Amino acid sequence: MSFEINWENLTSDSSINESLKEFLDRQFQNISLPSYIANLSVTNFSVGDIPPEITIRHIGDPFDEFYEDENDEGSSGPERVSSNSNMNTKETNYMSSDDEDDDEDNDLSTILSTIAEDSHLNSFSHSSTLYHSHEQSPPPGPAPTPPLLLRSRTSLDPISYIMANTSLNYLHNYNINNIGLGHAPSGTETPTTILNQNALTNAKNSRVISSLQKTTRGENDIQIIAEIEYSGNLHVDLIVNLLVNYPSPNFISLPIKLHITDIVIHSIATIAYLKKAVYFSFLCDINESTPDYFSTSSSSSVSTSTAAPATPTTYNSGGNFVDYIADPNNRERIDIVKKIKIESEIGELENNVLRNVGKVEKFLIEQLRNIIREELAWPSWICIDMSEDEDEEEQTPSPDSRDSNVNSI
C-alpha cells in the first residue's frame, strides 16, 4: 500500500523548520568539540520540497512506550518537537501466572500476516551500551531466538529483554515478509513482534507488559510501520570557527560556513498518532546491496558493512535472516543516513588550514550521523505536538466576542 503526502502543506509551515533547526542546534551544543574548532551552531534548516517515498508495511496500535512517554511528561506537556532519548525509568519486576499465559496462547495465531515483497532489513538497535550476560558462540542447528537489547529506559520494554542463554552480541537481518497488513491482538504489537521472525516465541513476554501498562487509548490512535525512501533536497547550514593553535592557542580564528545536502535514507520507521501528537522513530535500515532486492526468492543473500564487520552464518528456519557476530562496542548497528554531502565556504588560506577544513567536515558528518541515530533510532523517538495550534485557536476570541467586550466597556 502506498500513498502520497501533501508535502507542500508541511513545508509551508515555517515553524516546523524552525523547531527542527533549534532541536538540531541543541544537540550540536552538547557535543565535545575538538581543539581545532569552536562556536558550532546551526543557522538554517529546511526539509526541502521533495517528499520521501513511503510504502505502508503494517497498520496497528501504537507501541506502549509512546503512552508511557505521555504519562512521564505529566502536566508540563510536550514541546513542539521533543525527544525521549536516554530516558531512564525505575525498573519493576512482575510475575504472570501460567494459567493466564495458556489462555492467551490461542490469540498468537493472528499476530502477523506476510506480504509478497522480499527486502532484507538490518537489525534495529539503539546506540546505548549493550548488557552482556554471557559470552559464547552462536549455537548450531536451528535459528536461535533473535536477541533483544537492553535499553536505557527499562528492562521491561518490548525490545529490551535479556536472553538467558544467548549472547547479546548477535545481530540479525530480517526480511520484510515479517511485516504485513495483518492484525495482532490489540496492545501487543512491539518492534520485536513486528520485525522478529520468532515473534510467536516472545509474544508472551510482550503481553505481560501490555497487561501491566494501564493506559488510556484513544479510538483514533493509530500507528503505521512504513518503508521510507528519501533522496530529496533537505539541507542544513552550519557555521563554525576554525582555530589555528600555532604558534599559540587560538592564534587564528576563521569562521566557516558549511552546507549539508544530498541526504539519502532508506529505512523502516514507525509513525504513530495519538492524543494530538505524532511520534516518529526509525526501526531498522534496508539493505539494497543485493540485485534481487524485490524478488521473492527464498535464497538468502549475505552482505557485510563497515559498520558491523563479521562472519555471517545462515540458518534454515523458513525465513531469510542472517546472524552477525559484531563487536559489542560498535555503535553503528543502524546508520539511517546512507549518503550525505557537505560543502564548505572558506577564503584562500595556507595549506595547513585547508587540511583542517577536511577534518572539520569529517567530524561534523560523524556527529550528525550520531545525533540522528541516538535521537531517531528506536528506542528513541521524536514527538511533534499537534495540539498547540488548536489551543491557540480556542484562546483567540472571535470578532463577535471582541465587539461584545468593547460594548460592555
Swiss-Prot record:
Amino acid composition bias (Acidic residues), ranges on this chain: 64-73, 97-106
Location of the protein in the cell: Mitochondrion outer membrane; Endoplasmic reticulum membrane
Source species, domain of life: Eukaryota
InterPro entries from the UniProt entry: Mdm12, SMP_LBD
Claim: Lipid metabolism is one of the keywords in the record: no
GO biological process, one term: phospholipid transport
One example GO MF annotation: lipid binding
Quaternary structure note: Component of the ER-mitochondria encounter structure (ERMES) or MDM complex, composed of MMM1, MDM10, MDM12 and MDM34. A MMM1 homodimer associates with one molecule of MDM12 on each side in a pairwise head-to-tail manner, and the SMP-LTD domains of MMM1 and MDM12 generate a continuous hydrophobic tunnel for phospholipid trafficking.
Domain notes for this protein: The SMP-LTD domain is a barrel-like domain that can bind various types of glycerophospholipids in its interior and mediate their transfer between two adjacent bilayers.
Protein name per UniProt: Mitochondrial distribution and morphology protein 12
Organism of origin: Scheffersomyces stipitis (strain ATCC 58785 / CBS 6054 / NBRC 10063 / NRRL Y-11545) (Yeast)
Native organism taxonomy: Eukaryota, Fungi, Dikarya, Ascomycota, Saccharomycotina
